[in-house]
Amino acid sequence: MAKGGFPGFGGNINNLVKQAQKMQRDMERVQEELKEKTVEASAGGGAVTVVATGRKDIKEITIKPEVVDPDDVEMLQDLILAAVNEALRKADEMVTAEISKITGGLGGIPGLF
């Protein structure tokens, strides 16, 4: 075996370890940043708007008064569900984009978020 390395690791395991440690620090930083970053989604032409963080916490739900109809609560529920699901999908996309900046597009790393 070559000095300072293992076969298949480009000859220097120390560089690989340093890169992994940097990636871990970067991931921790991104996790903290995602607590503050938000995405917004709406349904019903803006009748219901939802704001979620990158950690998938719902921060705000706004409902326009004109869509509140006591005789059609089901429609309002559907609008809220659609807006929340869209906000969570956008949060997932944001997380994926942030992670790919760190991993260089190597794909998702299971269990990070």
From Swiss-Prot:
Organism: Acetivibrio thermocellus (strain ATCC 27405 / DSM 1237 / JCM 9322 / NBRC 103400 / NCIMB 10682 / NRRL B-4536 / VPI 7372) (Clostridium thermocellum)
GO molecular function, one term: DNA binding
Gene Ontology cellular component terms for the protein in this record: bacterial nucleoid; cytosol
Family: Belongs to the YbaB/EbfC family.
Primary location group: cytoplasm
Protein name: Nucleoid-associated protein Cthe_2143
Keyword set includes Cytoplasm: yes
One Pfam family linked to the record: YbaB_DNA_bd
Alphabetical keyword list: Cytoplasm, DNA-binding
Subunit structure comment from the entry: Homodimer.
